[in-house]
Amino acid sequence: MVWSRDQRRKVALENPQMQNSEISKQLGCQWKMLTEAEKRPFFEEAQRLQAMHRE
């Protein structure tokens, strides 16, 4: 969610005509292409945000 939130804004700004469902499909493909090392900071940030929310 952390990664997709930022990426969704970028894609929507670059492609204002694109439907939300199309953006989601594109983001899904992009996410799958990332390596585990590239994904790790986003997982860590999500965990940090979850911990803050629980407090």
Curated annotation (Swiss-Prot):
<keyword id="KW-0963">Cytoplasm</keyword>
<comment type="similarity">
    <text>Belongs to the SRY family.</text>
</comment>
<dbReference type="GO" id="GO:0000978">
    <property type="term" value="F:RNA polymerase II cis-regulatory region sequence-specific DNA binding"/>
</dbReference>
<dbReference type="InterPro" id="IPR036910">
    <property type="entry name" value="HMG_box_dom_sf"/>
</dbReference>
<dbReference type="GO" id="GO:0005737">
    <property type="term" value="C:cytoplasm"/>
</dbReference>
<comment type="subunit">
    <text>Interacts with CALM, EP300, HDAC3, KPNB1, ZNF208 isoform KRAB-O, PARP1, SLC9A3R2 and WT1. The interaction with EP300 modulates its DNA-binding activity. The interaction with KPNB1 is sensitive to dissociation by Ran in the GTP-bound form. Interaction with PARP1 impaired its DNA-binding activity.</text>
</comment>
<dbReference type="InterPro" id="IPR009071">
    <property type="entry name" value="HMG_box_dom"/>
</dbReference>
<feature type="DNA-binding region" description="HMG box">
    <location>
        <begin position="1"/>
        <end position="55"/>
    </location>
</feature>
<dbReference type="GO" id="GO:0030154">
    <property type="term" value="P:cell differentiation"/>
</dbReference>
<keyword id="KW-0805">Transcription regulation</keyword>
<dbReference type="InterPro" id="IPR050140">
    <property type="entry name" value="SRY-related_HMG-box_TF-like"/>
</dbReference>
<keyword id="KW-0010">Activator</keyword>
<dbReference type="GO" id="GO:0005516">
    <property type="term" value="F:calmodulin binding"/>
</dbReference>
<keyword id="KW-0221">Differentiation</keyword>
<keyword id="KW-0539">Nucleus</keyword>
<comment type="function">
    <text>Transcriptional regulator that controls a genetic switch in male development. It is necessary and sufficient for initiating male sex determination by directing the development of supporting cell precursors (pre-Sertoli cells) as Sertoli rather than granulosa cells. Involved in different aspects of gene regulation including promoter activation or repression. Binds to the DNA consensus sequence 5'-[AT]AACAA[AT]-3'. SRY HMG box recognizes DNA by partial intercalation in the minor groove and promotes DNA bending. Also involved in pre-mRNA splicing.</text>
</comment>
<dbReference type="Pfam" id="PF00505">
    <property type="entry name" value="HMG_box"/>
</dbReference>
<keyword id="KW-0726">Sexual differentiation</keyword>
<keyword id="KW-0112">Calmodulin-binding</keyword>
<dbReference type="GO" id="GO:0007548">
    <property type="term" value="P:sex differentiation"/>
</dbReference>
<keyword id="KW-0238">DNA-binding</keyword>
<protein>
    <recommendedName>
        <fullName>Sex-determining region Y protein</fullName>
    </recommendedName>
</protein>
<dbReference type="GO" id="GO:0016607">
    <property type="term" value="C:nuclear speck"/>
</dbReference>
<dbReference type="GO" id="GO:0001228">
    <property type="term" value="F:DNA-binding transcription activator activity, RNA polymerase II-specific"/>
</dbReference>
<keyword id="KW-0804">Transcription</keyword>
<dbReference type="GO" id="GO:0005634">
    <property type="term" value="C:nucleus"/>
</dbReference>
